[in-house]
Swiss-Prot record:
GO terms for biological process: signal transduction. One of its GO terms (molecular function) is olfactory receptor activity. The gene is OR8S1. Belongs to the G-protein coupled receptor 1 family. This is Olfactory receptor 8S1. Disulfide bonds join C97-C189. It comes from the Eukaryota.
Length: 359
């Protein structure tokens, strides 16, 4: 496209959430509280998983990276939004805008891949519990996690390198509170066809592709849970994946509503965007902390004066996820001797000896 006599702009102007100073002050306090809560929740979860050997399992390795991604995603969006709520001049350079777009792509793409990897982990734990330790070996879950980061960075690099070549002329007002690629493309006066193709591929591969992987995993999981005859068995099996299922629903639900809305700056579009970029990172760690029994158990243990001791002699361990006084088809009960633990030892270490225990 010929640029003619258009002057090239070097900064963008954000309209933000509101022009009313009183509303902006109220929103500043609200979003600052949410941001601080997000940081504290995710840091606490990270430190807990790191410090406690009982939580050194594939699921918690995924969860630690998910918490770190949520922490980064929130830190990319919220600080600049808080600055704009207090500032009269809501501008940012083109380079700064593209830097924010890059890290949004990295964190959002990595989170989508991590959620699909966690879905596969839950699929292996529920559908093939006897082989879980062999399926989710250290090499596999390390590859899944670091592969998620690699795909996130690759996706961001491709999209931003194409955006660097775009020229922005005259129109520089963004009807939003943050900088995202769909908001920038209409402002360009150069050819954006390649950027549109790259954005479409990113949406299909990272968004739709990972969603299909999660959907297929949970189709098998639900089928397996429904095949369990006892109500308590079904309840225990479902509880192992309820936190992840809630996080997936929140992520894809809010993301779908956000990206289906036009970038017009309408109140309803801004509400869905705030839900996706500000509220969801805060809720993820809260969901896992409240729904996961081991995380709640570790918090309780830290408040106790001592850890409970195992009874001496031969203890018998029954896999808790499916059986309760009866045998389920395809999931036979196994009784496994547990080695007595010394006082003060982690009670979870005894459970690692049981390969049939649901992770």
């Amino acid at each position: 496209m010929a640029l003619g006599n258009h002057s090239t702009i070097t900064e963008f102007l954000l309209l933000g959430l509101s022009a009313d100073p009183n509303i902006r002050a109220l929103l500043f306090v609200l979003f600052l509280g949410i941001y601080l809560l997000t940081i504290m929740e995710n840091l606490m979860l990270l430190l807990m998983i790191r410090a406690d050997s009982c939580l050194h399992k594939p699921m918690y390795f995924f969860l630690s990276h998910l918490s770190f991604v949520d922490l980064c995603f929130s830190s990319v969006i919220v600080p600049k939004m808080l600055e704009n709520l207090l500032s009269q001049r809501k501008t940012i350079s083109v380079e700064g805008c593209l830097a924010q777009v890059f890290f949004v792509f990295v964190t959002a793409g990595t989170e989508a891949c991590l959620l699909s990897g966690m879905a596969y982990d839950r699929h292996a734990a529920i559908c093939r519990p006897l082989l879980y330790g062999q399926i989710m070996g250290k090499q596999l879950y390390m590859h899944l996690v670091w592969g998620s980061w690699g795909l996130g960075f690759l996706d961001a690099l491709i999209n931003v390198l194409l955006a660097v070549n775009m020229v922005f002329c005259e129109a520089k007002i963004i009807h939003h509170y943050s900088y995202e690629m769909p908001s920038l493309l209409p402002l360009s006066c150069s050819d954006i066809s390649r950027s549109l193709i790259a954005l479409l591929c990113s949406t299909l591969l990272h968004g739709l592709g990972n969603f299909l992987l999660v959907f297929l995993s949970y189709t098998r999981i639900i089928s397996t849970i429904l095949s369990i005859s006892s109500t308590s068995g079904r309840s225990k099996a479902f509880s192992t994946c309820s936190a992840h299922l809630t996080a997936v629903t929140l992520y894809y639900g809010s993301g779908l509503l956000r990206h289906l809305m036009p970038n017009s700056g309408s109140p309803i579009e801004l509400i869905f965007s705030v839900q996706y970029t500000v509220v969801t990172p805060m809720l993820n760690s809260l969901i896992y902390s409240l729904k996961n029994k081991e995380v709640k158990g570790e918090r309780s243990l830290r408040d106790s004066s001592h850890l409970p001791q195992l009874h001496k002699g031969q203890a018998r361990w029954k896999r808790p996820a499916f059986t309760e006084g009866r045998r389920e088809p395809g999931h036979p009960e196994l009784s496994i001797p547990v080695t007595p633990q010394p006082q003060g030892a982690c009670a979870c270490s005894a459970l690692r000896a049981a390969p049939t225990a649901l992770p």
